[in-house]
Amino acid sequence: MKLTDKQINAIKEEYAQWKDKMYADNSVSRRKDFGQFFTPPELSIKMLEKFENTEGTILDPCCGAGNLLAAAIKAGFDPTKVYGIEIDEDILNIAQSRLVPLGVPCANIHLGDALNPNSYDF
């Protein structure tokens, strides 16, 4: 699947807006403490171009500010089948504020540590 130039530009614009806020609000040491490494929009787009079927469900276990999930929606995934988990509540709030206007239910973006098997009972 190829994204249109309009979709690519929208993803880049969203990324630039939240990146400025995120870096202003979060120190380098805090990002290191949480192991935060954000996926650039260009990489999110390249990853999603590999999907031939947008009928499924997407789960990003370390969704950050939602770059990959926003790109998935713009690529044609159903927003109600997009899920994210984020350990940092401040970054989670950014993800929710970006994804809810795109149609993702707020309840689909969870606060939690998806890398810790003891965090969930499923």
Identify what each model region corresponds to.
Residues 1-122:
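SAM-dependent methyltransferase catalytic region
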